[in-house]
Amino acid sequence: MKIVRIETFPLFHRLEKPYGDANGFKRYRTCYLIRIITESGIDGWGECVDWLPALHVGFTKRIIPFLLGKQAGSRLSLVRTIQKWHQRAASAVSMALTEIAAKAADCSVCELWGGRYREEIPVYASFQSYSDSPQWISRSVSNVEAQLKKGFEQIKVKIGGTSFKEDVRHINALQHTAGSSITMILDANQSYDAAAAFKWERYFSEWTNIGWLEEPLPFDQPQDYAMLRSRLSVPVAGGENMKGPAQYVPLLSQRCLDIIQPDVMHVNGIDEFRDCLQLARYFGVRASAHAYDGSLSRLYALFAQACLPPWSKMKNDHIEPIEWDVMENPFTDLVSLQPSKGMVHIPKGKGIGTEINMEIVNRYKWDGSAY
C-alpha cells in the first residue's frame, strides 16, 4: 500500500466570547486534519493541534515529501522518524495510518486492536469555566445547567485561575445547581503549590461528589504530588502533556497519581497512547484520556478505552470516562458522534466507522492570516 497523496486541512474559528482556565483565555480554536491516500484508494484521517503556520510548513516542506512513496503498512517506523521532527504531527500520521491498516484488513480500528470489551464509554462534560465578565460565575452555572439538561452525569470545571475564595464560591454555586448526584471534577491546570492545593481538602469532606482533583501542582514537584495524594480524600489525576509512557514511569513509581490522563495528540502517536493506558493497568491506577483539543483524537481515545481491560469489578463503574468538550467549538462536530445520557456508543464500521464532516472542513478553512 504505497502512499501516493496527502491532503491537509488547517481549520480556524474565532470565538464569539473568550473562555478559559488558569492558563488564560482562549479566543480561537484550531484544528489540523490530514488525509493520507494509498495507491489502492484506501485512505485514513489524522488530526493534530499546534500553531497552524508551523504545522502547515512542517507538513508541506518535510513530512509530506518524506511520506510520499512509502508503504502505509510501515506505521511504526514512519511515525518514529516523524517524532524527531514534530511529535504532534507524528500523532496525526499515526492515526491516519492506523485507519488505513484497519480498512485494508476490512475491519474497524477496534477489531484491528483485538476487539472491544464494551460497546459504549462514559464521557464527562468539560468546561472552560472562566470568562472576561464580572458575572463569570453565573455564566458558568448557566453553561453547566444547559449540559446537565442534555443528560451528562459527570462534569469537569476549572479552578486555580482566580482567588481561592472566589473559586470556592463558584464551586458552591455549581454544587447547588448540579446536586450531589452529579460527579464533579476540579481541574487546577498546575496552578497551586502543595499548601494551596491542600486547602481544598476542607471542602472535599463536604462535597461527596468530587471525581478527582486534576493537576493541582507543576509536575516538577513529584514529591509534593506524592505527599498531597497521601493526604487528600479524593483521587489525584494528571499528565495530559506527557509525551509517552517513559514520562509516566517516575510519577507512577513514586505513587504521585491515582489517574493518568494521556492525550492522543500530545504523545508520540496512537500506539504510544495505548501503551500509556496499559502502563496504568500494570501499575494499578486508572486512566482517563485528556481529549479536549480534537474530535478525531477523542474518537481514537474512545476506541482505545473500549479495548482497555476494566480497572475494577464494580458494576457500572469498571471503565473510566473520557473528556467531552462542550464549549463553543465547531470542530467538536467534525465526527458525528453525540453522547446520550453521558454515554457514547462506539462506531462499528470499517476504519473509524464514520465520516469526517466536510461541510465543517470547508467552512472553517484557515485563510493563512495571522491570529
From Swiss-Prot:
Its EC number is 5.-.-.-. Its cofactor is Mg(2+). SUPFAM superfamilies: Enolase C-terminal domain-like, Enolase N-terminal domain-like. It comes from Bacillus subtilis (strain 168). Keywords: Isomerase, Magnesium, Metal-binding. Mg(2+) binds at residues 214, 240, 290. GO terms for biological process: carbohydrate catabolic process. This is Putative isomerase YitF. It comes from the Bacteria. The lineage of its organism: Bacteria, Bacillati, Bacillota, Bacilli, Bacillales. Belongs to the mandelate racemase/muconate lactonizing enzyme family.
